[in-house]
Amino acid sequence: MSTDKKTLGEKPNSTKPELSEELIAELKKQRILEKNRPYKKMIYVDNKVQRKHRHENIAFLKTLHENKESDVPKKRRGRKPKHAPLKEKNNLKLFDILEGSLKSHIENDDTNTVINLLTEAWEKKSKKKQKNITLSNKEIISVLAKFELPEDEIIYVLDELRDKGIQLQHDVEEHIHEFRANQDLSIIDEDIEELTSKNISNRDKVDDNVRFFLGSLDFSKMLDFESEQRIAKVLNSTDEESRKYAINQLVTSNLRLVVSIAKKHLERGLDFNDLIQEGNLGLLKAISKFNWSLGNKFSTYATWWIKQAITRAIADQARTVRIPVHMVETINRLAKAERALYQELGREPTDEELAEKMGGQAEGFNVKKIAEIKRLSLDPVSLDKTVGHDEESQFGDFVKDTDAQTPDEFTESRSNSEKIDELLNNNLSEQEELIVRMRIGMPPYNEPKTLDEVGQKILIPREKIRQIENKAIRKLRHAVRNNPISMSFLRINEKKD
């Protein structure tokens, strides 16, 4: 692309440089006229051709920028025209767009910062007076990782470095392309570093085995689409060794993905090593179900199987008392509805409002059902849980035991038990005493027995047992009249067989 007068279509008396349709089409094709250029996968063609076109575009934009003030005549005094000529209006609009593009390409602070940082790194190396000093790919990527530069800005940075005489490695573009394609890995590395740091809470701390596993993830590199397709084809091979090799390649290349997904499910009841193991099982499930012929990327397909395996394990194993999976989904629906109503109403919703939000009676939700779901969603608290700032007290120290007796109550209860035992021994036969104790639930029996249960125990028909029981009760009532003691067990007629 050329910037001479013939190509520009410049007229002697024009206030703005006029662009030919061919040049405008070329600029649009290279996306210079777009303010926010969307990210596209970097395609490396001939770098010399790219640098040539880019320098021509920037040189042309600089020419427009320098001539902006000199070409525009002074404004005349008087009334302004209602409408500018259409041709001049289009030129002004296009000029403003090109000026904005010029600023984004030349005056980008992040771009200049990256260039300055890499130049300083090169100068520090040059002071050592070594031969064949080269700026390594690792040094370049470490600086680029701190800034979110678009594709064209990164290539512009490399061109500027080459123009300054800084030697770069021949495969720098390919390494940057790999870095851009695997940007998720940098986020995963930050997660892994956070997990292995000393600042995480006790609940999130991982044991030595998990630390060793996280430290050994350097060999886990995400595969590109072509490599995944090539390896996935081997999964259908009849050779057992080839299939094992393909499975091993897909597993090792996606271990970081498992760690990234597992970290998002911390603080939900399972240890981190358990989450990783469940995620690995989901990864193996994805490998067995993957169909390469559909053209999907394996990492995208495996993400859903890993998430399903982890969430299912949390639902089955995280709670002390297991809640069915369908009830866990209902609890999640209720929590989502509660958050939506809170944002809408600006207050905590009532159970009636939640029931209506969940579908009402048509879906089987009422106030009683909502209260039951809320009760199930509560996590059990350990009595040994430490409380307070000093963490010396336990939660169980503050829980009242409703079955506990005071010394006075214990003494009275013990005295009544002795008198009852004496009353039974003095007035009833062994068989009658046994039947009364079993029917009422007196020691050594902890709960009342039915007539059938008593009959099976002493091998007597239930009707006979009922007769013996009534006879024994009459004897006890007669004895109580002479020795008034509070005996609630004598109200046998209130019991139901």
From Swiss-Prot:
Motif Interaction with polymerase core subunit RpoC in this chain: 274-277
Q: Where in the cell is it found?
A: Cytoplasm
> Which InterPro entries does its entry note?
RNA_pol_sigma-70_dom, RNA_pol_sigma70, RNA_pol_sigma70_r2, RNA_pol_sigma70_r3, RNA_pol_sigma70_r4, RNA_pol_sigma_r2, RNA_pol_sigma_r3/r4-like, RNA_pol_sigma_RpoD_C
Q: Which domain of life is it from?
A: Bacteria
Q: Is the keyword Transcription regulation in the record? A: yes
Cleaved signal peptide residues: none
What quaternary structure, including any partners, is listed in this protein's UniProt entry? Answer: Interacts transiently with the RNA polymerase catalytic core.
Record family assignment: Belongs to the sigma-70 factor family. RpoD/SigA subfamily.
Please identify the protein, giving its name as recorded: RNA polymerase sigma factor SigA
What is the native source organism of this protein? Mycoplasma genitalium (strain ATCC 33530 / DSM 19775 / NCTC 10195 / G37)
